[in-house]
């Protein structure tokens, strides 16, 4: 069970499907639209806060994005190569529909992904080889905003969480930058996803 406190300007939906219920937050402007189906929250409470703003609390079972993505993966595979920070080439096989970030985690490649694919950091920043860079869809405004915060930004920079493997990416190379930027509280040790 997970509890989310929602402020004004944001609404939530509980989705049924895949591995089970999933709570999803959507902005009022609809930036994160898609996949609305059979929304039935287990518990919804509203209250007024100071200054007239309202909040809602939803309690629901939540599945991780990684679990949800596994349900949507194709059996078709593509071969790609990661170049780690030391320059070592790491050839891997990924499933069509899998993100580059999830693929890196599956093979224990040090691509952090601190925000768990929520477009709130740039720790999964990668360089895409130019032959394949133009085969990717254009980044949306939110990805561009996060890339602006990435150190060592290049023309071929993308976020690994936003690159979804397709058959056209067979043979692509993803190079990890020498550094990434993340903010931690003293003593924090990142956990693998």
From Swiss-Prot:
A Gene Ontology term for the protein's cellular component: mitochondrial matrix
Keyword terms: 2Fe-2S, Electron transport, Iron, Iron-sulfur, Metal-binding, Mitochondrion, Transit peptide, Transport
One GO process term, biological-process aspect: ubiquinone biosynthetic process
Cofactor names: [2Fe-2S] cluster
Subcellular location: Mitochondrion; Mitochondrion matrix
GO molecular function: 2 iron, 2 sulfur cluster binding; electron transfer activity; metal ion binding
Keyword field contains tRNA processing: no
Chain residue ranges for the region called Disordered: 38-70
InterPro entries: 2Fe-2S_ferredoxin-like_sf (IPR036010), 2Fe-2S_ferredoxin-type (IPR001041), Adrenodoxin-like (IPR001055), Adrenodoxin_Fe-S_BS (IPR018298), Beta-grasp_dom_sf (IPR012675)
Family to which this protein belongs: Belongs to the adrenodoxin/putidaredoxin family.
Known function: Electron donor, of the core iron-sulfur cluster (ISC) assembly complex, that acts to reduce the persulfide into sulfide during [2Fe-2S] clusters assembly on the scaffolding protein ISCU. The core iron-sulfur cluster (ISC) assembly complex is involved in the de novo synthesis of a [2Fe-2S] cluster, the first step of the mitochondrial iron-sulfur protein biogenesis. This process is initiated by the cysteine desulfurase complex (NFS1:LYRM4:NDUFAB1) that produces persulfide which is delivered on the scaffold protein ISCU in a FXN-dependent manner.
Name of the protein described by the UniProt record: Ferredoxin-2, mitochondrial
